């Protein structure tokens, strides 16, 4: 499992636009989307790579990415915004959740002995969450914290935890991998909202991996202007499963005057209804601005929600934002 980048920013698109967010972009995608017109020169071969706006995450053999070998590599990247080492109450160790002391406590160990869905992982100070019920365990037992921990918990209410946005590429390619799933479970146990950005082609096994039921899915089904074959870009069974099982899900589509998206969006909605957010195409501020009015008119005509692309409006083409 390889990580392209991680960074603190705001969510720039969709239903949760404007929210404080920490992004993890994982390498790997099952689509190329050459029709989107993005181009980048391979630093290894000099070849011109064509695809979407995240070419580094798609053409993985052409770029150097960080190999993720353990959970702490990921958790250590989440920044300190609260004056402590992480977002859990009473943190005590740099970069690792200070709720470790709680995870090591007799309270947890005795509960784990009685609770089949709450199991201690031998390799990391974390919980192996195998049921939705376990996601509430730490929150319920945090009521028994000592006075110092309780004070830290009270001060934690003064700031917002960032949502954790897991993106790619296509992050759900990794959803069955043990380390990836443990990462999601740990984030949820710490009280983070976990959001996935996905193309909706991967059928997620919500029964075997129930923690995903507590996550939000921003789904961007690819239309014919992606230049991907229909059988590769649309998986209606996967879309229906996301809609039925996820904590929340919604569609995002990029709209431009050159392509009539409405017939294809209607087809997707007929197969699986969900909220729709439409965004103007825009690789830079100028293109975004020029397409905004058309996109707004498209939304008004068809009854969809408009979404800006705040990261492009603020930072332009800059990576890592």
Model segments located where?
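Conserved AdoMet/S-adenosylmethionine-binding subsite of the radical SAM
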Residues: 159-162, 172-321
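N-terminal pre-triad scaffold of radical SAM enzymes
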Residues: 1-51
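Short, solvent-exposed loop/turn segments at secondary-structure boundaries
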Residues: 16, 63-65, 229-231
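Short aromatic/hydrophobic contact patches that present stacked aromatics
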Residues: 23, 165, 252
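Conserved Radical SAM active-site core
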Residues: 1, 35-123, 128-130, 136-213
């Amino acid at each position: 499992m390889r990580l392209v980048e991680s960074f603190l920013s705001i969510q720039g698109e969709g239903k949760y636009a404007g929210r404080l967010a920490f992004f993890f972009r994982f390498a790997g995608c099952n689509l190329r989307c050459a029709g989107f017109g993005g181009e980048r020169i391979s630093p290894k071969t000099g070849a011109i790579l064509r695809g979407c706006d995240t070419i580094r995450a798609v053409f993985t053999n052409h770029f150097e990415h960080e190999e993720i070998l353990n959970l702490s590599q990921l958790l250590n990247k989440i920044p300190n915004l609260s004056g402590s080492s992480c977002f859990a109450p009473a943190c005590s160790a740099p970069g690792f959740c200070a709720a470790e002391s709680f995870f090591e406590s007799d309270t947890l160990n005795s509960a784990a002995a009685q609770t089949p869905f709450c199991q201690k992982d031998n390799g990391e100070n974390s919980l192996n969450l195998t049921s939705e019920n376990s996601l509430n365990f730490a929150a319920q037992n945090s009521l028994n914290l000592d006075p110092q921990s309780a004070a830290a918990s009270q001060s934690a209410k003064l700031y917002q935890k960032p949502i954790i946005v897991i993106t790619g590429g296509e992050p759900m390619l990794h959803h069955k991998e043990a380390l990836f799933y443990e990462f999601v479970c740990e984030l949820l146990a710490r009280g983070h909202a976990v959001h996935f950005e996905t193309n909706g082609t991967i059928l997620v096994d919500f029964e075997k991996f129930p923690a995903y039921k507590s996550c939000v899915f921003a789904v961007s089904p690819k239309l014919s202007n992606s230049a991907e074959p229909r059988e590769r870009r649309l998986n209606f069974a996967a879309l229906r499963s996301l809609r039925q099982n996820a904590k929340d899900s919604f569609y995002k589509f990029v709209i431009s005057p050159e392509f009539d998206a409405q017939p294809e969006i209607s087809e997707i909605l007929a197969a699986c209804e969900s909220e729709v957010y439409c965004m103007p195409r825009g690789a830079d501020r100028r293109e975004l601005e020029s397409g905004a009015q058309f996109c707004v008119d498209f939304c008004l005509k068809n009854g969809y929600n408009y979404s800006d692309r705040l990261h492009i409006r603020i930072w332009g083409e800059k990576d890592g934002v």
